[in-house]
């Protein structure tokens, strides 16, 4: 049976799941029996240290047709669009914005379509992130990929994806996200003729739900809305290619079978998807615009309490009702660095120039905020009426470390050289009181 005919999901975030595509494949009461049912092999996939605290420990046991060790020797793939070289050269403090990444003119699958924009940290140190775009027009048929450097957060903007993994099938569409754990093998099939989107490669602590604090027990992204696939497998032999991302480079090896041959598995280290339209948005119902941390969907913790390695936040449809308040996002300089993208519609802080598929980067202490047209409109708005922002889905990868743009991003033809001009219309309107006014 093809894998896509086995697509179904289990619900919950970080749950201890157990699933089998063939009845009787999961051992009862133990992980590694002397002989696994149906002639399968037992293999553990560890996403954290064995000794990580129980509440943070992530691992799954896989029962598969062949162990993951069965493949040929790896050789380096010479390519230049995907890398983790963020260490050299000065980083300009400019605000930056890019138009959408052009779609490919020749056959390009997901792996070949990856394009690194910026990053910080390193896979060696297991801290930081890399931000990539992807643009593809072909499915991965006899090719499989895994990333040993970090987990992958996929944000589709154009076109639907079917992500066939060792642990089951994720189908994603724009306004949904998918997370692929570090090390998990998968292939990406296009369900439409073209696909484009964003990828955050997280080298640091595994993504988790943010603490809710005074919000209470419910709100933001609710755990029940996350979906993890049930076991699904394929048994194919032939000439296939296994591509690995390891220490910032791509490597390839021959493999004589499909590695998506896990018949059953149990554990809490698994891929998942989430529909951003289910996010329970929190906002002010009195005055002022709260800090954007209230829009956090997932967070990767750092070694500093209260400071994330990376936060993934969204700006979804919502009502703005704050009184005597400038309702759009305010002008800001931030110790953190912000990479933004737009999946759908219009972003409420930018009247023009920020298109779906585009991106912006506001690094540490770079001033940013609404453009002149948005400021003028919001400053004169009738606050007796709510602003209903109904047609939007923007997002942000916010990192504690500076995001160092790659040379290809700095020199890209789709970089908007005149981005700073969106603030040029913000004129000085200060009128100090006269002596008569003071009296």
Swiss-Prot record:
UniProt entry keywords in alphabetical sequence:
Dioxygenase, Iron, Metal-binding, Oxidoreductase, Phenylalanine catabolism, Tyrosine catabolism
Where Fe cation binds, per the record, is at: 332, 338, 368
Which family is it part of? Belongs to the homogentisate dioxygenase family.
According to UniProt, this protein's pathway is: Amino-acid degradation; L-phenylalanine degradation; acetoacetate and fumarate from L-phenylalanine: step 4/6
Q: What is its EC number?
A: 1.13.11.5
Q: Which GO terms describe its cellular component?
A: cytoplasm
This chain's protein is named: Homogentisate 1,2-dioxygenase
EC supergroup of this enzyme: oxidoreductase
Leader sequence segment: none
Q: What cofactor requirement does the entry state? A: Fe cation
Known role: Involved in the catabolism of homogentisate (2,5-dihydroxyphenylacetate or 2,5-OH-PhAc), a central intermediate in the degradation of phenylalanine and tyrosine. Catalyzes the oxidative ring cleavage of the aromatic ring of homogentisate to yield maleylacetoacetate.
Residues noted as binding homogentisate in the record, renumbered to the chain? 347, 368
Subunit structure of this chain's protein: Hexamer; dimer of trimers.
Its gene is hmgA
Q: Which reaction does it catalyse?
A: homogentisate + O2 = 4-maleylacetoacetate + H(+)
Which organism encodes this protein? Xanthomonas euvesicatoria pv. vesicatoria (strain 85-10)
**Active-site residues, Swiss-Prot/TrEMBL:** 289
Q: Which domain of life is it from?
A: Bacteria
Q: Name one GO biological process term.
A: L-phenylalanine catabolic process
The root-end lineage is:
Bacteria, Pseudomonadati, Pseudomonadota, Gammaproteobacteria, Lysobacterales
Pfam families linked: HgmA_C (PF04209), HgmA_N (PF20510)
Q: Listed GO molecular functions?
A: homogentisate 1,2-dioxygenase activity; iron ion binding
List the InterPro entries: HgmA_C (IPR046451), HgmA_N (IPR046452), Homogentis_dOase (IPR005708), Homogentis_dOase_bac (IPR022950), RmlC-like_jellyroll (IPR014710), RmlC_Cupin_sf (IPR011051)
